């Protein structure tokens, strides 16, 4: 029964890759990219300064995370791509698993007939797991993920804490 539950989860996962879902996600991505700030505004070196105290760091980070959220998402996306391109074994494992799941789902529950015999879908999934897990451990996904988290945090929080807020927001925060 546990295998049927796992198979149902995988089936629901692959249904998320339907053309309608892909189109709606693409439109959502386009609207998110429309809120990107210009490079001149994002890399404005005139607005970079050392914060006076930790309270100022907190207010800068809170403001800049909202204001530059699309830019920060793009930076994290670029760092993710860089991570996969520098760890080719991990990229291979990800492609292998996705291609294996898509290929098994194209069988639509039928057996795969080869000259070596016929294989049921649960046998194919088991074979995929038996191949992907050991190679996945060799690809060091945990250290790659930790590097990605660290590099993203340093990049995003470093920029957000050093970039000054616009002068208008300083006057809005003051109470008279």
UniProtKB/Swiss-Prot annotation:
Q: Which taxonomic lineage is given here?
A: Eukaryota, Fungi, Dikarya, Ascomycota, Saccharomycotina
Pfam families, per this entry? PRA1
Q: Where in the cell is it found?
A: Golgi apparatus membrane; Peroxisome membrane
Q: What is this protein called?
A: Prenylated Rab acceptor 1
Give additional notes from the record. Answer: Present with 5500 molecules/cell in log phase SD medium.
One term under GO cellular component: endoplasmic reticulum
- Keyword Transmembrane present in the record's keywords: the answer is yes
| InterPro entries (alphabetical) | Prenylated_rab_accept_PRA1
Residues bearing N-acetylmethionine? 1
Family, per entry: Belongs to the PRA1 family.
């Amino acid at each position: 029964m546990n295998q049927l539950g796992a198979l149902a989860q995988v089936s629901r996962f692959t249904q998320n890759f339907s053309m309608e879902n892909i189109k709606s996600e693409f439109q959502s991505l386009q609207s998110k990219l429309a809120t990107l700030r210009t490079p001149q505004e994002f890399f404005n070196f005139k607005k970079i300064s050392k914060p006076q105290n930790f309270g100022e760091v907190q207010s800068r980070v809170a403001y800049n995370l909202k204001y530059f959220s699309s830019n920060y998402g793009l930076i994290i996306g670029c760092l993710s791509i860089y991570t996969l391109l520098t760890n080719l074994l991990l990229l291979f494992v990800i492609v292998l698993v996705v291609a294996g799941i898509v290929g098994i789902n194209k069988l639509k529950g039928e057996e795969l007939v080869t000259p070596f015999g016929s294989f049921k879908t649960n046998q194919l999934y088991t074979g995929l797991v038996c191949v992907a897990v050991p190679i996945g451990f060799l690809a060091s996904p945990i250290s790659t993920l930790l590097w990605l988290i660290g590099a993203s945090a340093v990049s995003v929080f470093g920029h957000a804490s050093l970039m000054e807020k616009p002068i208008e927001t300083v006057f809005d925060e003051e109470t008279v």
